[in-house]
A protein has these predicted regions:
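Mature N-terminal, pre-catalytic/accessory segment of carbohydrate-active enzymes
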Residues: 1-69, 79, 447-457
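Alpha-helical scaffolding within the catalytic cores
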Residues: 26-33, 56-64, 93-98, 143-150, ...
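Substrate-binding cleft and catalytic face of glycoside hydrolase catalytic domains
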Residues: 66-217
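Noncatalytic carbohydrate-binding groove/subsite architecture in carbohydrate-active enzymes
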Residues: 171-288, 292-296
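Aromatic/acidic polysaccharide-binding cleft in carbohydrate-active enzymes
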Residues: 258, 264-342, 348-360, 369
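Carbohydrate-binding surface patches
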Residues: 353-401, 440
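Solvent-exposed beta-hairpin/edge-strand motifs
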Residues: 395-415
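C-terminal beta-strand-rich structural cap/linker in extracellular carbohydrate-active enzymes
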Residues: 416-457
Length: 457
């Protein structure tokens, strides 16, 4: 007889074990403690729980893993076509499970109102055309009635509403959808936050809102920066553009992530990604956004089974049966970032520095209880699969330390920094032979880093 077929519970996470077996040549003193979302008062971190409206994943499979991740927000898609299969009759049971299932874990849902509905001759796919919705009075009226029903149902739990997803340069039709939808939401829920997806149509939509005197309808402008190097597309130009129309506008990195395998379609396709580079990519995206004060949503919590493929962006690996296989290294990395960088950690911004490394290095500065915290990483190239660190002499300006420790943020390993290898002079600190690589490492005061001795499984 042959060997029994493995079940999802018997698979080993090979890449996670290799991450744990690697590390800088420093003395490990523990592992950074993780936090459940219930134990974090507030933060700007979000994770994607998208595509449940099209059954590309099952919420019940990963529900508990969202709270364990430590994020305080999660993005859902409302699924007009799934909620209204018969004209005028709404079934929100499936969405109730998601909204209230997140809320009970102290994770605040934010909802993207989308897509079209075949019973009103509009489509429900990614990139769905808006023309059938806005150029038919019956369909637009039905859409607004659906929005009203959705907002009224969840307004005690949800106050952040994104209008459509990735309208793909349909600026005239998107503006025609945005204005009545946003006006309705603001009427139904005066404290609501309206988010607009940017996808090649920002300026024309802004111009139309300005012409109509409706700039106040929008609070956040969302962008989806899928770039091979996560340190590109940092949002500064986008922020400058939208704030030139209204200083109240804020930007939101509402969807970005990295595949864990070479994909042949969707964002980031045709590049040989792995679970090693995925983990580095996600953490660099998070660190770069957070340094700039940009709220961030990581795409996505679990692999998505599209009709023609199994997409590998998930922090959790799943199979074609929607079964959970294992948490990828990226899951642990996001967990460590979300657990430490809550709203008690204040943003300082990018810090000036000097190093003897030929590679471009980013140093992000923060403060926790008035004490310095920094994230440091190579930011010049696409994340590699290498599990090796370079010894670098680094002087950080504007960061003083008294008893620093070194944290590798993917594995969460905490290391001693020998006293002979660092010194603080005034507000600057110099480290000798500090191990750096193309993923964020954190330096923080020992007293600020809650540790555990347990090895992470």
């Amino acid at each position: 007889m042959g060997k029994p077929k493995p079940t999802p519970q018997t698979f080993l996470n090979v890449t996670w074990n290799k991450f744990k077996a690697s590390g800088p040549e420093l003395k490990q003193i523990g592992w950074i403690a993780t936090k459940h979302s219930k134990d974090i008062q507030s933060s700007s971190w979000s994770v994607g729980c998208e595509t449940l409206d099209r059954d590309y994943a099952k919420f019940s499979v990963y529900k508990g893993y969202v709270g364990q991740l430590g994020v305080k927000h999660a993005r859902l898609q409302s699924g007009w076509a799934k909620c209204e299969k018969e004209k005028g009759v709404y079934d929100f049971v499936w969405l109730d499970e998601c909204v209230y299932g997140l809320n009970e874990q102290k994770v605040k849902p934010w909802i993207c109102l989308c897509y079209g509905n075949p019973i009103y001759k509009s489509t429900l796919d990614l990139g769905a055309g808006l023309a059938p919705v806005v150029h038919s009075k019956e369909t637009l009226d039905a859409w607004l009635k659906y929005v009203e029903a959705t907002v009224n149902r969840y307004k005690d739990t949800v106050n952040e509403w994104e209008i459509w997803n990735e309208p793909f340069r349909q600026e005239k039709d998107y503006a025609a959808l945005l204005q009545p939808t946003a006006e309705l939401i603001k009427k139904l829920q005066p404290n609501s936050v309206v988010l607009v997806t940017e996808y090649g149509c920002t300026r024309p939509v802004l111009d139309e809102l300005k012409t109509q005197g409706k700039l106040d309808l929008v609070d956040y402008w969302i962008y989806h920066p899928y770039s091979l190097n996560p340190d590109q597309g940092n949002g500064e130009g986008f922020r400058k553009l939208v704030q030139s129309y209204s200083p109240k506008y804020r930007i939101y990195q509402g969807e970005a992530g990295c595949p864990s395998a070479l994909e042949w379609t969707h964002a980031m396709a045709f590049y040989p990604w792995t679970e090693y580079s995925q983990a580095k990519w996600d953490l660099r995206r998070m660190a770069s956004d957070h340094m700039r004060g940009i709220p961030t949503s990581v795409f996505t919590i679990i692999d998505l089974r599209y009709t023609n493929m199994l997409q590998s962006f998930g922090l959790i690996r799943s199979n074609l049966l929607h079964q959970l296989i294992y948490k990828r290294p990226a899951y642990y990395g996001v967990q460590h970032m979300a657990g430490f960088f809550d709203d008690t950690v204040k943003i300082v911004g990018e810090l000036k520095h000097k190093s003897n490394s030929p590679r471009k290095t980013t140093v992000a500065g923060f403060q926790k209880d008035g004490k310095s915290v920094v994230l440091v990483w190579y930011s010049d190239k696409i994340p590699s699969d290498d599990l090796k660190w370079d010894p670098v002499d680094l002087t950080i300006k504007g960061a003083a330390f008294q008893d620093p420790v070194y944290v590798e943020m993917i594995t969460g390993k905490v290391f001693e920094i020998a006293k002979s290898t660092w010194k603080t002079e005034g507000e600057n600190t110099t480290f000798s032979q500090l191990p750096l690589w193309d993923s964020p490492i954190m330096i923080a005061e020992r007293s600020q880093v809650e540790m555990t001795k347990d090895v992470k499984d």
